[in-house]
């Protein structure tokens, strides 16, 4: 079921975070000790920041390993139900996304599952470094403030357009395209959502 895949993915993310946190913490601690012994206090701040980052990674990794009791699941309890719906009521699937009657998720990361009604904006985002395209994603802006990204780098224009069209056909509350109108709509809907939750 989708719930088991979601929990498995959370567990693997937790392990990656935990290992990365331990490695970063160990490296920064060893370098911190070396710099203290040598008396170079000017770079001390950088290694303290690295140590803090390592501790944050460890904390998040341990939290993800709690599975259903993780803060991520407690903050978004509907995610387990939506993940199950993806397996039971699947209506569309391709190399990039899975869509059910109620939910949408990138195929590679079920932890980013979202309700179809919560998708407010759909647009492409291209990032360049020195004029070279380094990232090409389709962003789904959600009502709760999250953003689901689908990597479409090095895919044909037709594939990208078809993907956006398919998603927009299932997400009836969503505006398509990056514009001031779309951004203000997303901002307004998120504000209403926060007011209802409080």
Predicted regions and their residues:
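Loop-to-transmembrane boundary segments
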Residues: 10-19, 107
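Anionic N-terminal interaction surfaces
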Residues: 2-4, 10, 41-101
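Acidic, Ser/Thr- and proline-rich intrinsically disordered linker/docking segments
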Residues: 123-198
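Short, Lys/Arg-enriched, disordered terminal segments
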Residues: 1-14, 191-198
């Amino acid at each position: 079921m989708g719930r088991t895949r979601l929990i498995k993915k959370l567990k693997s993310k937790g392990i990656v975070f935990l290992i990365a946190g331990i490695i970063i913490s160990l490296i920064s601690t060893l370098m911190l000790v070396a710099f203290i012994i040598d008396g170079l206090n000017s770079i001390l701040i950088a290694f303290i920041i690295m140590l803090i980052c390592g501790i944050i990674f460890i904390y998040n990794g341990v939290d993800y390993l709690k599975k259903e009791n993780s803060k991520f699941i407690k903050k978004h309890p509907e995610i387990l139900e939506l993940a199950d719906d993806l397996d039971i009521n699947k209506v569309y699937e391709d190399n990039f996304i899975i869509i059910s009657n109620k939910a949408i998720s990138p195929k590679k990361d079920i932890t980013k599952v979202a309700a179809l009604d919560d998708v407010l904006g759909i647009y492409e985002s291209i990032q360049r470094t020195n004029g070279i395209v380094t990232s090409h994603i389709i962003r789904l802006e959600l009502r709760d403030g999250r953003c689901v990204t689908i990597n479409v780098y090095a895919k044909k224009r037709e594939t990208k357009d078809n993907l956006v069209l398919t998603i927009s056909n299932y997400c009836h509350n969503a505006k398509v395209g990056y514009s001031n109108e779309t951004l203000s709509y997303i901002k307004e809907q998120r504000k209403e959502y926060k007011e209802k939750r409080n």
